[in-house]
Amino acid sequence: MEHPIAPLNVYGASKAAGESAATAWRKHYLLRTSWVVGEGKNFVATMASLAERGVDPAVVADQWGRPTFTQDLAEAALHLLFTGATYGTYHVSNSGEVITWADLARAVYTGTGHDAARVSNTTTEEYFADAQVFAPRPANSALDLSKLIAAGFTPRDHRDALAEYLHQLGRARED
C-alpha cells in the first residue's frame, strides 16, 4: 500500500473500507486529510466563539497535526484534476509547522484579539476521562505532503489560511 493506514476506531475502519473500494478503480484520486476547517461547526469556529464569550478552555496538547482549510482542500483537488496528475492517493492539509490542538486554539484566541494565555493544556486522557464514549485519535495526524507538492501543488501555510478564515468569520458575525 502506498500510504499504510492503521484505523484506531470504527469510524477509521469505515474510512479504510471506503478507501479500499475507491482504490479498486485504476483511475482514482484519493485525498486523505485531517483537522478539517470550513463553514459551519468546527474546532476553529468553536474556539473563536469561546474566546468571544470569555471562556478559558483546556485543550488537548498531546495530539499533533496541521489543519486543512476547505478552500485549500478544494484547490488541491481541482489542481490534481485539471493538471492530469498521476492517479493515486494524496495527503492534503495546509503546510507549515506541525502543531497541537492547544497551539491552534491559542492561535485562534490571538487572531481574534484575545489573550492566548487563557487557553490551558490538557492531555487526551484527562480531556476524555469522564466521557461516556471515546473514539481514539492518533497522536500524530501530520500528513506527508511531498507527493502533492511533487504534483505541482504547494498548500498555503496554515497560519495564513487561519488568518483569512478568522477575518471571514469576523465579517460573517458582523452581518
PLM feature segments, named:
Residues 59-64, 90-98, 150:
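Glycine-rich Rossmann NAD(P)(H)-binding loop
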Residues 76, 83-133, 164, 170-175:
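Mid/C-terminal beta-alpha module of Rossmann-like enzyme folds, strongest
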Residues 23-65, 71-72:
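NAD(P)-dependent short-chain dehydrogenase/reductase
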Residues 7-14, 62, 66-70:
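The catalytic Tyr-centered alpha-helix of NAD(P)H-dependent dehydrogenases
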Residues 136-175:
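C-terminal amphipathic/interface module of NAD(P)-dependent oxidoreductases
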Residues 1-31:
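Catalytic helix-loop patch of NAD(P)-dependent Rossmann-fold dehydrogenases
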Residues 44, 48, 70-78, 159-166:
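Short, amphipathic alpha-helical "lid/cap" segments that border enzyme active or binding sites
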Residues 12, 30, 67, 98, ...:
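Short aromatic/basic micro-patch
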